[in-house]
Regions:
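Helix-to-loop junction immediately C-terminal to a conserved catalytic motif
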Residues: 74
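Conserved ABC transporter NBD signature motif
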Residues: 82-93, 133
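Short helical segment in ABC ATPase nucleotide-binding domains corresponding to the A-loop/adjacent helical element
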Residues: 113-121, 131, 135, 246
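Conserved ABC ATPase "signature" region
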Residues: 128-147, 197-203
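Conserved ABC ATPase signature
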Residues: 152-156, 160
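Hydrophobic anchor residue at the start of the ABC signature
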Residues: 166
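Conserved catalytic motifs of ABC-family nucleotide-binding domains
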Residues: 173
Length: 263
């Protein structure tokens, strides 16, 4: 990744990098024939720490609105009322934040290389440049040698396809990335490997220099503590934050972290 690219995606200095303000969310429940309240005057502010990336984890039981929060910030859903801010500014109609879902999503008739290059080509980057930058990101996520394979099973495993999705989300150098239970569909062994892959990835200089903010939704408390600098625990009816935790663990972590008594 070129230095000129990485400097285009810096957070504001201080303040909140992501914020939800006075959010109301209702929908009509066809079973009860009444309005159901998801959020009632809900507020959440994720602080910006200039010069470092951060991993924010949102946990909570089903129905508390975790994925809805992600959809607000990515522009996939609007609240009934309230304000959504990104980098201190109202979320714009044409603004986009990349999102990786539980079920990996790829264009199966495209190669891995062309899947990863797609966000750049959609932005008008030449095919040659897009492929060059895509190849750099493919190396970062450990898929070098697979770039010419079709992005589908059985040519790639489920874990490899999630790496393709992550590489595609990062290739345009975003300063934010949203992950909605990205490992939920994987078996336990692959899930553990992907957790450490993500930990290693965001400590690599190619990614860390972008100082990204990553928002992860998970049900797994061990995953939350392993990856998160900030952990928000939610409850439902209506959705609300009941606890905010900053794990007493070093920002730089590796596999040995799970052997520490504090973990």
């Amino acid at each position: 990744m070129s230095k000129s690219q990485s400097t285009n995606n810096q957070h504001n200095n201080g303040g909140n990098v992501l914020e939800l303000r006075n959010i109301q969310q209702k929908y009509f429940d066809t079973k009860t024939r009444k309005d159901s309240v998801v959020f009632d005057n809900f507020n959440l502010a994720v602080e910006d720490y200039p010069g470092i990336g951060q991993f924010v984890v949102i946990m909570g039981r089903s129905g508390c609105g975790k994925s809805t929060i992600l959809r607000y910030w990515t522009g996939l859903q609007k609240p009934t009322s309230g304000e959504v801010f990104v980098d201190g500014k109202p979320l714009a109609e044409n603004q986009s934040i990349p999102m990786v879902f539980q079920q990996y999503s790829s264009l199966e008739w495209f190669s891995v290389l062309d899947n990863v290059a797609l966000p750049l080509t959609l932005k008008g980057v030449s095919k040659k440049q897009a492929r060059e930058h895509a190849m750099e990101m493919i190396k970062v996520v450990g898929l070098e040698g697979h770039e010419n394979k079709f992005a589908k099973i059985p040519q790639l495993s489920g874990g490899q396809l999630q790496r393709v999705a992550i590489a595609r989300s990062l290739v345009a150098n975003p300063n934010m990335l949203v992950l909605d239970e990205p490992y939920g569909a994987l078996d336990g062994f692959t899930r553990a490997k992907m957790q450490f892959f993500m930990l290693d990835l965001f400590q690599k200089s190619e990614i860390a220099n972008l100082n990204p903010t990553v928002i992860l939704v998970t049900h797994d408390p061990r995953e939350a503590v392993l990856l998160g600098n900030d952990i928000y625990i939610m409850d439902a009816n209506p959705g609300r934050i009941i606890k905010h935790i900053k794990p007493d663990l070093p920002d730089k972590r590796d596999k040995s972290i799970r052997k520490q008594p504090r973990f």
